[in-house]
Amino acid sequence: MTVKNDIVLWDNGREKLCLLTVPNEHQYKYIEGISCITFGISYENMNFKGCDTFTLFDHFYSNIVNEIESTYTSLNGSFRIYDVGADTDGYIELVMTNGKLSVKGQLGASFSSHSLMFEFEADQTLVGNLLQEITF
């Protein structure tokens, strides 16, 4: 399963973070009946652009959805989305304090020749958009 549509999670005119659909042939296949979602995350600014694919399944999926819901509801908290595989060490980490959001991440594997690290500030709307799109 993947997200329904490509969507912009955040765009302040300088930086843009998007959630992307993943073609069926590139989605991770897990055990029938167990929660599993595969999606892409892309980041771009005036000079760089990068993307990576993440798969959340089983208790990793349930835990991250609970962490996102808690952070969004309280406007405080943090969570880290990462792929649980040996093929990448990409991640996106979100820390919210009183509705102000700090986002940092790495798209692509640090051990490959191409990866992109980024960091920017946003607000709680990014977390709400993310939660809405990955919850099924």
Positions of the model-derived regions?
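Intrinsic, low-complexity N-terminal interaction/targeting segments
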Residues: 31-38, 88-109
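Mixed-charge, glycine-accented linear interaction segment located at domain edges/termini
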Residues: 107-136
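Short amphipathic beta-strand/extended segments with alternating polar/hydrophobic composition
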Residues: 18-22, 49-57, 105, 114-122
